[in-house]
Design a protein with these regions (language model features):
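Phosphate/adenylate-binding glycine loop and adjacent helical scaffold
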Residues: 2-164
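Active-site-proximal alpha-helical scaffolds that flank and shape metal-associated catalytic sites
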Residues: 5, 106-159, 176-180, 203-301
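A short, N-terminal "cap"/entry segment at the start of jelly-roll beta-barrel domains
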Residues: 121, 128, 132-137, 351-399, ...
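An amphipathic alpha-helical core segment
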Residues: 273-337
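Acidic, carboxylate-rich catalytic segments that either coordinate divalent cations
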Residues: 315-365
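Double-stranded beta-helix
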Residues: 382-385, 389, 442-475
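A short beta-strand-loop-beta hairpin characteristic of the jelly-roll/cupin
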Residues: 401, 407-429, 439, 466-467
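Short beta-strand His + acidic residue motifs that chelate non-heme Fe in jelly-roll/DSBH
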Residues: 417-418, 425, 435, 440-447, ...
Length: 475
């Protein structure tokens, strides 16, 4: 039994067992719905039953040391969150798109007994692996102060992010990537809470005190309008390959808690945090995209925003007090722990998204950095560690991240490179680009064959160049 005073997630029971679970993960990922992507699948044709997992990565990922705050954007976090989201949504019905036999087969394969059984075995391990850090060394307060911090931090982040995208002339493309993270994943978060409510996990609270992610249709309408304005119009999960690991983690945290009745109080806290984060984003989006806001919306401006935030904080405060009164200090502490875990994840997600958008919006600078680094390699360390690849026409890499900084340098052939929906950065012989540690990207070969190198770049080299970029931005 897990007591309210313990961590929400604990990897220690799985210590020394990683090899066994990796074997199960390999079996799960070997199924047809999870095979690596083909070049035509960069954006899926509204195929809910297709989830490229890059099974080849599980040949070298060990899952021995759980995720920590500093590596939330790296490959183990990406792989574990893609796998978890696939497992959780084996319990969500999406019917075949048509009567075609191949479509029916995809539908049946996705929900197969093998997938269900393997998923049930894998999920507790991956949850502990991916989420232990969220409540580790945490002493949350037993009130709603964490929600106020989330509202403030998220509001500041979004205002600064939209301003930077405008400065870098990347607003439309940046919004496209943002809406993939927000609008495309919103149904998963709502479904997690609906599943929890149907299972009675919110029954400790009266309806008027419960957290909610679908309580204002006007927000959903604005999100859909903004998404459509930048070309994000397909159903969930058409943009699967462009989800950041931390974006999926926010969905998965809700799913993980929602399937465990003994974590019900933790779910209440995490759900209130998800509502606070969503509210801060909606208000910031309304400010940034006022031209897409309906004429009768937001008439109160700042006063209306403040009222909505105050209502959330008051409702959450009453909910925590109600839990403490009815179920005791341990239950209230677990609810606060849920807020604290989500607050920590929100901070890491802001960092992850901010770094991805900085890289994408400054890609021309990272091309220039690559040439400077290449010159330095030739002068100082020509034998630097590197990987070389020779790939055939239409060889496609499912989007992925690296655990180090790398150059991509084309020796011969042509490649298309991307890190965002709609991005096609053409690379020919002699072209190169710097890919920082943890930045999501993919590519495909468009010539008959392509030979390219990936030198691994010391962190201090990259940080010095990024500091130049930061200095220019601040002047």
């Amino acid at each position: 039994m897990t007591h309210a005073s313990s961590s929400l997630f604990d990897f220690s029971p799985f210590a020394g067992q990683s090899e066994r679970y990796v074997d199960l993960i390999k079996q799960f990922a070997a199924a047809q719905p999870f095979r690596s992507a083909e070049v035509s699948e960069l954006v899926l044709d509204d195929d809910y039953h297709r989830r490229p997992l890059r099974p080849e990565d599980f040949e070298f990922l060990k899952f021995a040391k759980p995720v920590r705050p500093h590596n939330v954007s790296r490959l183990p976090a990406l792989a574990s969150n893609r796998t978890l989201l696939s497992i959780y949504e084996l319990g969500t019905a999406r019917l075949p798109r048509n009567a075609n036999e191949a479509e029916w087969n995809r539908f049946v394969q996705f929900y197969s007994d093998d997938a269900q059984v393997l998923g049930a075995q894998i999920a507790p391990f991956l949850e502990a692996y991916a989420f232990e850090f969220l409540s580790r060394d945490q002493t949350p307060s037993a009130d709603a102060a964490g929600l106020a911090r989330i509202l403030e931090a998220e509001s500041l982040f979004w205002d600064q992010t939209f301003a930077r995208l405008m400065r870098n002339d990347y607003l439309e493309e940046g919004l496209r990537f943002i809406m993939v993270q927000r609008w495309s994943l919103a149904p998963s978060k709502q479904r997690a809470l609906a599943r929890a409510a149907a299972s009675g996990l919110f029954d400790m609270l009266p309806v008027e005190l419960r957290p909610a992610l679908d309580n204002l249709p006007a927000d959903a309408a604005l999100h859909e309008k903004v998404a459509a304005s930048c070309g994000v119009t397909r159903q969930q999960h058409a943009y699967w390959q462009f989800y950041l690991p931390t974006s999926m983690a926010k969905c998965n945290l809700l799913y993980a808690l929602a399937r465990r009745p003994d974590r019900a109080f933790g779910l209440v806290g995490a759900a209130f945090a998800a509502e606070a984060e969503a509210l801060a984003f909606s208000l910031a989006l309304e400010r940034a995209c006022a031209h897409l806001t309906s004429a009768n919306r937001g008439a109160g401006g700042a006063a209306d925003a403040q009222a909505r935030q105050a209502e959330l904080l008051e409702r959450a405060s009453h909910a925590l007090q109600s839990i403490g009164t009815a179920y005791g200090a341990s239950a209230q502490a677990m609810a606060a722990q849920g807020i604290g875990a989500a607050e920590r994840l929100c901070e890491r997600a802001r960092w992850d998204l901010g770094e991805q958008l900085l890289w994408l919006s400054s890609i021309r600078h990272y091309v220039a950095f690559a040439h400077r680094i290449s010159t330095r390699i030739d002068a100082e360390c020509p034998d630097i560690d590197r990987e070389t690849f020779i790939e055939p026409h239409e060889m496609c890499s499912t989007t992925h991240v690296h655990n180090d900084h790398r150059l991509v340098t084309i020796q011969e052939g042509e490649m298309l490179f991307w890190g965002n929906v709609g991005m096609q950065h053409k690379m020919n012989e002699g072209d190169m680009v710097l890919i920082p540690d943890g930045r999501l990207h993919g590519s495909t070969v468009v010539s008959g064959e392509c030979t390219y190198h990936q030198p691994i770049i010391p962190d201090e080299w990259v940080q010095a160049l990024v500091a130049e970029l930061d200095a220019k931005a601040s002047t």
